[in-house]
Amino acid sequence: MKRYVLAAGLALAVITVLGLVGQQKARSDDPDGNVVSEYANNGHGVRVIWGQHTVVDGSHIATWALVDPHDGTILAAGATFSLELAEEMPDPGDGPDGAIASLEFPDVVQEATFLYHIEIQSNPQGHEAPPGSVNPDRNRVPHFDFHFYSIPEELVWLIPAQAPPLPKVAADYLPAGYTQPGPSIVEMGRHAAPQWSLTDPDPLTAVMLAGFLPDGSRMHFLEPMISQDVLLSRQDFALDVPMPKLFGREMLYPTQFRTVFHGNACSLVFSDFVNVK
């Protein structure tokens, strides 16, 4: 029974977080979401812990975690933004590889889970598809790259561009159903894609990529890549989370990802964390 109660509280709290960020433009005097934290804490069985917050072209963006107030269990972690971001498709920013925002997660998330910070890249013109794609223009649609990194931003700045041949990722470290990653992109790393995406003739809608360090030693980001059209459709959806057999360290790792909409806000939610060794 507790599982279902927590699930209901989690869903309600996510909606509450969404409502806050969707209203932030009119409530810039409350950037930390104290009202929402109190609402979730006192009335709905979950506690909201806020990470960092910024404003990009009028769109408020915040990171957060939802935890069980009784035992501190991390129920979900994510980022929420108002949909002005998708409507405007900002030009590249001054973050790594042109990121328009780079926000750390709360300490409790950084200390215990795979997630350390998020970087958001806006691609109004799209970009090339991975080598071997049957549709080389698949990713040449307006979209966002949401990089959920397991390492600090200062280490992302140090990642070099490197062309193949590069070391293969060991089988136990490569998620099942994913391709070997390609070249290393400067200030980002190497991208591995679901094998099905290379044979998909249709334009990009949404896909979950896995990122690897240049030497292929370990996975260091999860990347939901989502088109502008999908975001503006305001329809909730889920993506499978890549699950390697080995990670190289012990931590909590998310097994579920969903995108949830509420009014003029969108939330990218990782949940159902499991302990990996």
Label every model-predicted segment.
Residues 3, 7-33:
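Bacterial Sec-dependent N-terminal signal peptides
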Residues 26-277:
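Metal-centered catalytic cores of metalloenzymes
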